[in-house]
């Protein structure tokens, strides 16, 4: 169950270190296990999310933290939008204009994550927006491959050329901002 403490004060996104139970519940419902011994890492710089730029009132700053796992270093993460390999966490983006983009390099149209250390052959297709960027790393231990698709940035008729729909788990994970504007999902 999510509470206000699970979200940043200055941003609409949830805090990765607060949603491990959410990842475990989702994984359990899909028949996989994502239990892992994460290491909590906290960045030295403060995080001022989207609410900070929308208000002229004083506001609280957040600390941006993430959960590391040695297994992430072995993952092959491909950003197909820009045809390049990326990391699970891009620490350079953590000091940029939108620090939340440190999670899987932000909102990209198509990302694949291959986990050579997975104890399963299960695959996940995740239709998502930016909210899943911090959740997806927590699902990596339960899957051999995760394909992240943001259909706001890729034509749905092109999906079959990128994704082989054959016995994968499928998860639709969108914020209320996207769900309340269904035209974004066409």
Where are these regions (language model features)?
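Extracellular glycan-modifying ectodomains
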Residues: 1-186
